[in-house]
């Protein structure tokens, strides 16, 4: 069986075409903002290379040249790890005014399409993860599960009336009913909001997901033009695609979780340290920034020895899993205040 293809992505927005990204803040076309994500990219591939040395690694982006960050030669680092960089245009870019935030998220649909078309064989597994995800263990069990199920999905544990990017699952269900031909009043079970931080599956299933998403996108554009409820971001749309294809929900839950580590609303808990992948939205400007320094230093603890339990404990202490230490709390507070001053508006 072929090695998995592990990918992440970054779409750099242009001046005048910015969107809103609340977890980072600031102007999305600025060097400051984009450096936050490039640091995440470095950490993503560094961690995966440590625990998945035999995997294929690929970066999708719209930039022609990967920039240096903080004086660090990002492109050379990725080349040393054997990361393939694919410059991919944004074919699924929503029109201006489609939704007020997260305008780059539909880029994932283009990434999934390209990934499905380039996997080497029918049993090959590819995965697309957000760049603020960190591998802590080898991906073998996740890959085996993807072959078994065809695709893996993460139940993001969003309540029926909890809004996620402008829609609650109950409101999503009304759109499902219309798309399924039953009309908005058809009712039915409230659907599960499937997290968009992971799209993983075999070549055949990823191709089916891409086909279904491509077929659905014109309807979303029509609804936008008509002022009708629509899927505002890729996770809304992919949740419906999984529903339509009969792909079960929650098969990725044993491997990955969305872990909030902010000063308020934290969801991190004991047991998270045992997961294969940590998705850490709140650590983009905090722990992942410090991890970037370690990953960029070939003599640091990050590259020393084998990625064993001691390595994972050091990783967890840096990223706040399974909890924030007093030292990390103090460093995070200082960084959060500094970011408020330095962040371009």
Which residues does each PLM region occupy?
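Short aromatic/hydrophobic "clamp" motif used to bind/position activated sugar donors
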Residues: 126
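Short acidic donor-binding/metal-coordinating loop in glycosyltransferase active sites
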Residues: 131-133
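Long, low-complexity C-terminal extensions of enzymes
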Residues: 263-345
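Catalytic core and acceptor-binding pocket of nucleotide-sugar-dependent glycosyltransferases
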Residues: 180-283
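Active-site-proximal specificity loops/subdomain of glycosyltransferases
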Residues: 66, 70-120
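Conserved donor-nucleotide/metal-binding helix-loop-beta segment in metal-dependent transferases, i.e.
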Residues: 135-174
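N-proximal low-complexity "stem/linker" segments adjacent to membrane-targeting elements
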Residues: 1-43
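Short, acidic, metal-binding catalytic loop of nucleotide-sugar glycosyltransferases
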Residues: 47-55
């Amino acid at each position: 069986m072929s090695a998995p293809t592990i990918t992440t992505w970054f779409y750099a927005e242009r001046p005048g075409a910015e969107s809103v990204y609340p977890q980072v803040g600031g102007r999305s076309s600025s060097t400051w903002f984009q450096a936050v994500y490039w640091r995440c990219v470095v950490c993503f591939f560094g961690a995966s290379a440590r625990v998945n040395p035999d995997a294929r690694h690929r970066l999708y982006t719209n930039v022609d040249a990967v920039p240096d960050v903080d004086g660090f030669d990002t492109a050379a680092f990725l080349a040393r790890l054997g990361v393939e960089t694919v410059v991919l245009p944004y074919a699924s870019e929503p029109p201006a005014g489609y939704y007020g935030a997260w305008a780059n998220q539909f880029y994932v649909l283009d990434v999934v399409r390209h990934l499905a078309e380039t996997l080497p064989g029918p049993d090959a597994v590819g995965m697309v993860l957000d760049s603020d995800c960190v591998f802590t263990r080898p991906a073998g069990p996740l890959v085996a599960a993807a072959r078994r199920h065809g695709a893996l999905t993460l139940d993001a544990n969003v309540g029926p009336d909890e809004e996620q990017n402008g829609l609650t699952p109950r409101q999503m269900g009304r759109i499902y009913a219309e798309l399924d031909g039953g009309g908005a009043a058809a009712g039915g079970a409230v659907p599960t909001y499937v997290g968009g931080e992971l799209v993983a599956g075999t070549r055949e299933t990823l191709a089916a997901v891409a086909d279904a998403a491509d077929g659905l996108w014109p309807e979303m554009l029509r609804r936008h033009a008509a002022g009708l409820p629509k899927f505002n971001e890729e996770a809304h749309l992919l949740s419906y695609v999984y529903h339509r294809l009969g792909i079960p929900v929650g098969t990725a839950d044993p491997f990955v979780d969305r872990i909030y580590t902010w000063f308020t609303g934290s969801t991190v808990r004991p047991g998270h340290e045992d997961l294969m992948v940590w998705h850490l939205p709140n650590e983009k400007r905090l722990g992942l920034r410090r991890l970037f320094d370690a990953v960029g230093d070939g003599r640091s603890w990050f590259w020393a020895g084998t990625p064993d339990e001691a390595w994972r404990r050091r990783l967890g202490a840096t990223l706040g899993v399974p909890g924030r230490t007093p030292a990390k709390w103090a460093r995070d507070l200082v960084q959060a205040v500094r970011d408020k001053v330095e962040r371009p508006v």
